[in-house]
A protein has these predicted regions:
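Carboxylate-rich, polar loop motifs that coordinate divalent cations or form catalytic acidic clusters
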Residues: 1-322
């Protein structure tokens, strides 16, 4: 919210880079001095409202006000032993449109805010469509919480699948479930399901690992196999795009998958087992990023260890070289 940058360090500290002072702040240090307890930070989830959840080892989690924490204030411990968190393992934290915070744990859902939901079910994925929260567990369970009725109900998924790997809201009406048996779409408008097989003549995997919808409403799916699949839902067009094997820059280990649109509207993709590329919408091809446009061999495709998108539409890459 404030433009500062969270930086979990290699040795488990939660450092906040203050863009005004241009200094790093070890946020948990004052708390550790006071409590004589050292934390090892696993990950940090920053919410749009200006609150961060600092998730540590051994069931310790801290909710931090991103302004007050710079002064060692506004930090609250959440855990099973302080009895304000359902489980000791947090899958994700989500902010809904009312700015309530949903914490999904291995033993149920905790909400910080005005809502309440009584469930011990270990949901792992969450998203919102209009006034409904959708909760999903990897074993194929789907539930809906309605803001108006304040009730949680399970929804039967009639499409064959064993596992849900990821979810995404498509537009304002559709929930997409990435499964081990293709893409399952649920229409919130009429409660109808539709299953899409992502296999093509060049791509035999129906296992969906990641879903993304671009501004042109195309849906992009990462399969297990090399490449990425582009889906145009209205026309049922399906296209497998990949980096030719003889052009793949090998790093000895796998890069993270990456897809985003920059502020000029260019779609960038780092497909499974491929090179960093941009999508040429006219030619419908992935094209490599060249450091010298006159030299087709000057491909720039680093090993991406981590990445983050900033509020200006830039993508920051943490590579093997920095």
């Amino acid at each position: 919210k404030y433009g500062d940058i969270w930086c979990p360090t290699y040795d488990g500290q939660a450092c906040l880079f203050d863009v005004e002072t241009e200094k790093f702040i070890d946020v948990l240090q004052p708390l550790e001095y006071a409590t004589k307890h050292s934390n090892h930070v696993v990950r940090i989830q920053s919410l749009k409202k200006g609150v961060a959840w600092i998730i540590c080892e051994n069931g310790y989690t801290y909710r931090a006000d991103e302004q007050l924490c710079k002064k060692g204030e506004g930090i609250t411990l959440y855990s099973t032993f302080t009895q304000n968190l359902k489980g000791e393992h947090i899958f994700t934290v989500y902010q809904d449109s009312d700015e309530d915070e949903w914490i999904l744990t291995n033993k149920g859902v905790t909400i910080v805010g005005s809502k309440a939901v009584d469930t011990d079910f270990p949901f792992q994925y969450i998203t919102q469509i209009k006034e409904n929260i959708y909760l999903v567990a990897d074993k194929g369970k789907l539930a809906q919480y309605n803001f108006r009725t304040k009730k949680l109900k399970f929804i039967n998924i009639p499409c064959p699948h064993n596992r849900i790997n990821t979810i995404a809201a498509l537009g304002t009406d559709t929930l997409a479930l990435g499964t081990d048996n293709g893409l399952i779409l649920f229409s919130a408008h009429d409660n109808m399901f539709r299953q899409i097989d992502i296999r093509t003549s060049t791509q035999p995997s129906n296992y969906v690992e990641q879903i993304y919808q671009d501004r042109q409403k195309d849906v992009w799916v990462f399969p297990r196999n090399p490449g990425i699949v582009r889906l145009h839902l209205n026309s049922n067009e399906k296209e497998h795009l990949f980096t030719p094997q003889n052009e793949v820059i090998k790093h000895g280990r796998n890069s993270r998958k990456l897809i985003f649109e920059d502020k000029t509207g260019i779609l960038w993709v780092l497909p499974t087992g491929g090179n960093l590329s941009y999508y040429d919408r006219k030619e419908k091809k992935l094209k490599p990023l060249l450091t010298d446009i006159d030299n087709p061999k000057s491909i720039f495709s680093p090993l991406v260890r981590f990445y983050t998108l900033d509020t200006q539409g830039n993508c920051w890459l943490a590579t093997a070289r920095g």
